[in-house]
Design a protein with these regions (language model features):
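Non-catalytic cap/lid and distal C-terminal segments of serine-dependent acyl enzymes
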Residues: 18-346, 350-383
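Bacterial Sec-dependent N-terminal signal peptides
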Residues: 1-20
Length: 383
């Protein structure tokens, strides 16, 4: 079954995305490194769009898994289109991840590889491709441990870290927990995903579960953390299960409002649900550099909360935003009319419904319904 899933992702990827193979001359390493790069569909057409950058260590075997998932998930708009870069390390993995026996930080060839990533690779990619400031690092085993050294930077090079069955260096858990506690004082959002499995390398599973316990005690609204401990999977088979979960965690704010978000975050608000909607899309813009049009699904979720909690005054603000994001449709006038209806201004409600006559219908809101509502008000009040 796993074979067919991977085969499907491969053909799905090949059908839509553009794969580029690049070589980069590295002064830090004194050699050439091979890269695999997946560009988003319609990359050339969307010439003004900038994209999140996902850097995949162990690109020899991880790149296709990550690229296929990115292509599939972004197709359904549960994450933005992204640029995926895989670093081939089959012949240099041991040298790339070399650590000091004293402080267990990158050393010699490991330090050179760190410099390559920090000072050369990102600049090389961003000089050739349109990347936003949002970056994710993905590693497996030794490289899952290695990516954490970028997390320790004062201003981390990456916003998101995906550690798949990490083979932690000594003191790595303590250093991570200490760093996470320091980040409590900052407002910068960081994402961290950690996974292991019941059939994982025993040392890796033990350390991952211990780290998860420690991280779970930290209350930090700026850190978006997710942990998976899969049953019946091994060090290698956990990878294709982890990647979609990790991406879901990294890009959860980008996704349409679902039932869980609606019930836990919106219905329970004591403040404005409209402000929540605005903040959600401002966060998308700030994190990913994307001006995303507010989805009809999300307008409907906020409207449902207004109705459920009888907070009808918020309909006016919702209508103003709807007219800004969907000006050619009846949506904004519908919410404005509902505001007038529920605040004792039926004549203004009738006029608002009728103002939508020249506008287009949209996902359950038709101009015929608007006119029917206007006629019903006219009949009831005798205007």
């Amino acid at each position: 079954m796993r074979f067919f899933i991977i085969l499907f992702l491969f053909f799905f990827q090949c059908s839509f995305s553009q794969i580029v193979y690049e070589s980069i001359e590295s002064e830090a390493l004194g050699t050439t490194r091979e890269l695999k790069i997946q560009l988003p569909r319609n990359y050339e057409l969307n010439s003004d769009q900038f994209y999140p950058l996902i850097v995949v260590f162990d690109g020899d075997y991880l790149f296709e898994v990550v690229a296929g998932n990115v292509e599939y998930i972004s197709y359904w708009r549960d994450m933005p289109d992204a640029i995926v870069v895989g670093i081939n390390q089959a012949k240099s993995r041991t040298e790339d991840t070399t650590l000091s026996v004293e402080d267990h930080f990158p050393y010699r060839s490991g330090a050179k590889f760190y410099e390559f990533i920090d000072s050369e690779l990102i600049e090389f990619i961003e000089s050739k491709y349109r990347c936003s400031d949002f970056r994710i690092a993905i590693g497996h085993g030794e490289t899952a441990n290695y990516i954490n050294y970028f997390f320790f930077q004062k201003s981390p090079l990456f916003n998101g870290f995906v550690a798949l069955s990490p083979s932690f260096a000594p003191f790595m858990q303590e250093n991570l927990v200490r760093k996470l506690r320091i980040e409590q004082k900052k407002q910068v959002k960081l994402f961290y995903y950690l996974s292991t499995a019941s059939l994982d390398i025993k040392r890796n599973q033990k350390q991952a579960t211990e780290l998860n316990y420690k991280i779970s005690t930290i209350e930090n609204p700026s850190i978006f953390y997710e942990f998976d401990n899969f049953e019946g999977l091994s060090h290698y088979s956990l990878v294709p299960r982890s990647i979609p979960n990790a991406l879901d965690n990294m890009f959860s704010v980008y996704q349409p409002i679902n039932r869980d978000e609606y019930e836990k975050n919106i219905l329970t608000l004591v403040s404005s649900p409209v402000d929540y909607l605005v903040d959600k899309y401002e966060t998308i813009k700030d994190l990913f550099g994307i001006e995303k049009q507010i989805l009809i699904n999300d307008f409907k979720a906020i409207a449902a909360a207004i109705e459920k909690n009888k907070q009808y005054d918020f309909y006016k603000d919702l209508g103003d935003i709807a007219r800004k994001h969907h000006p050619e449709t009846v949506l904004g006038f519908y919410y404005l009319a509902r505001f007038f209806e529920e605040t004792g201004k039926p004549k203004k409600a009738m006029n608002a419904y009728r103002s939508s006559y020249t506008l287009g219908s949209i996902q359950g809101y038709s101009k015929d319904e608007m006119l029917d509502r206007a006629d019903a008000i006219q009949k009831e009040f005798g205007y």
